[in-house]
Curated annotation (Swiss-Prot):
Annotated segments matching region Disordered: 341-361
Record-stated family: Belongs to the FAM131 family.
Bias kind Polar residues: ranges: 341-351
Name of encoding gene: Fam131a
UniProt-recorded name of the protein: Protein FAM131A
InterPro entries: FAM131
Protein's organism: Mus musculus
Origin: domain of life: Eukaryota
Length: 361
């Protein structure tokens, strides 16, 4: 009968018949001692008892051919507290399968923690939305654990409609954050060049740079969105005196030449604008009011919504139809073609001289 001595106490193992189970019997001294309680400890399969003469374990005992009487002093002492020493050397090193199983269990535990921390199952899992994404910061919570627990459980107490509304609000907030980030990135990259920015620069340039020399009448034309490009500050040519009254054909020609010269240099455009102001100052009151009404009319016309390069022809193609758009408002009187061309050149330069006037007479 095998015997095991644990901390000096004798435990006798006895098998109940061939193929039966093994039972542990203690001595009367151990059983009568209240400080001792027998606990069933399952030893690993590879543990061998050298005192029995053959390798036997608690799970697979084999009946010895002849009983052997073994003294209790010769039995080895087993330290129950040291679990590593109880394992055999072949089982102390973990195999790759056991490491993989440990990694899988650890990953499963981590994923479960993340799922409990980030997402919460809702009542919308029936084919619509499986989880409500509620981001919770991983930093140290400032609230008490009871408050956090109530915040987690508050969603499940809501009705289905309130849950859907809360989810829709969260999705809308995420879309707003994403759109704000995209706009910030595009503004950093310089892609956010809209018409509003041009309009702001345009009006700002008029108020600061061009308000003094241009006057209020041309500012009305600018604010009427007649020109689709911002005006840059250019060199202002000195004004010259004009003592002659300008005819309607000169006004129409100057308007067309002014529109054609927008693509030119800033100095040429500024001189044309100054010439228009001089012409406006010399007009009678009736014609001056008609000239002021050109800005709103041209702003409403769809022709001026197209780029200036499309509405203005080349100098070779411009001469036959130079004042086609202005003939409805200002009919041209009968006269020679040379005089019209000369007046157009005078208006495009923005200066009316006395020598050219004498030639016209």
């Amino acid at each position: 009968m095998p015997m095991i001595s644990v901390l000096g106490k004798m435990f006798l193992w006895q098998r109940e018949g061939p193929g039966g189970r093994w039972t542990c019997q203690t001595s009367r001294r151990v059983a009568s001692d209240p400080a001792w309680a027998v606990e069933w400890i399952e030893l690993p399969r590879g543990l061998s008892l050298s005192s029995l003469g053959s390798a036997r374990t608690l799970r697979g005992w084999s009946r010895s051919p002849r009983p052997s009487s073994v003294d209790s002093q010769d039995l080895p002492e087993v330290n129950v507290g040291d679990t590593v020493a109880m394992l055999p050397k072949s089982r102390r090193a973990l195999t790759i399968q056991e490491i993989a199983a440990l990694a899988r269990s650890s990953l499963h535990g981590i994923s479960q923690v993340v799922k409990d921390h980030v997402t919460k199952p809702t009542a919308m899992a029936q084919g619509r939305v499986a989880h409500l994404i509620e981001w919770k910061g991983w930093s140290k919570p400032s609230d008490s654990p009871a408050a956090l627990e109530s915040a987690f459980s508050s969603y499940s107490d809501l009705s289905e409609g309130e849950q859907e509304a809360r989810f829709a609000a969260g999705v809308a907030e995420q879309f707003a954050i994403a759109e704000a980030k995209l706009r910030a990135w595009s503004s950093v990259d310089g892609d956010d060049s809209t018409d509003d920015s041009y309009d702001e620069d345009f009006t700002g340039g008029i108020d600061t740079d061009m308000a003094g020399p241009l006057g209020s009448h041309l500012q009305d034309l600018f604010t009427g969105r007649r020109f689709s490009r911002p005006v840059r500050q250019g060199s202002v040519e000195p004004e010259s005196d004009c003592s002659q009254t300008v005819s309607p054909d000169t006004l129409c020609s100057s308007l067309c030449s002014l529109e054609d010269g927008l693509l030119g240099s800033p100095a040429r455009m500024t001189s044309q604008l100054l010439g228009e102001e001089l012409l406006l100052a010399r007009l009678p009151p009736s014609r001056e009011s008609a000239f002021r009404s050109l800005g709103p009319l041209e702003a409403q016309d769809s022709l001026y919504n197209s780029p200036l390069s499309e509405s203005c022809l080349s100098p070779a193609e411009e001469e036959p139809d130079s004042c086609k758009d202005c003939q409805l408002l200002c009919p041209l009187p009968t006269g020679s073609w040379e005089r019209q061309q000369q007046v157009s050149d005078v208006a495009s330069s923005g200066v009316v001289s006395l020598d050219e006037d004498e030639v016209d007479q």
